[in-house]
């Protein structure tokens, strides 16, 4: 994706014009090696596992073998993993669930087909996101939905559509981001070429920092996007239907924990807020 820079760690050319899109090469650890790591943490009594691979559900020959090895051992893990929307096929969900994958972080990003295809320059397959969410729910897998506001072609109307989609298709967890031109990403090179304002410090690339400096779109200022993102997050997490979903699935304590987080308003320099007490953030 144009906003992602994770593959930059694989680059073999350090020239300034090289981005993560030019470095889309990686190698898999063998499943028989990976299961050894699961064996080790199982012996330690660890149950909760987060698989950091952002594209775990991508290559069936890889992730299905890992699931098979976990299932064979009868481990009772509670696993969080990640998937693209278009690779999370229904035929894999039962096996993922039996291996202990109870959560999948899903890159929904934007429900608008045109906007989503603009940032996916690879072989992204078009899918009905609503169907994917329903299939995951039917399989007993909770979803961490990830949304991005302020993509290059975003307008206020399209951002409202994204929020409306999230509100109508509630997931157990929702991350809402402003589009950020991270160094090493194609979006960063495009922003520099276009003369767009970028952060002047690394904390400016943080989504929750006082110094956050997200990217402007072709139609909206950075400030308009950031304000919308912060308000959208609050709207979602104070939605009575969402809170009822949390309470029904995870109990009153979990619901109250989320409610307490909504009492904290992020301070933003670009939106005219005074610095938070206690120093820089």
Walk through the language-model features, giving the residues of each.
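Radical SAM [4Fe-4S] cluster-binding motif and immediate context
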Residues: 1-144, 164
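Conserved strand-turn element in the central/C-terminal portion of the radical SAM core barrel
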Residues: 84, 109-120, 133-158, 177-183, ...
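Acidic/polar loop patches that form or flank catalytic/metal-binding clefts of enzymes
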Residues: 144, 172-177, 243-244
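Histidine/acidic-residue-rich catalytic or RNA/ligand-binding cores of hydrolases
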Residues: 63, 159, 188-189
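Catalytic cores of alpha/beta
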Residues: 92-94, 152-168
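Generic recognition of well-ordered alpha-helical segments
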Residues: 132-135, 164-165, 177, 228-231
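Internal hydrophobic scaffold segments of catalytic domains
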Residues: 167-191
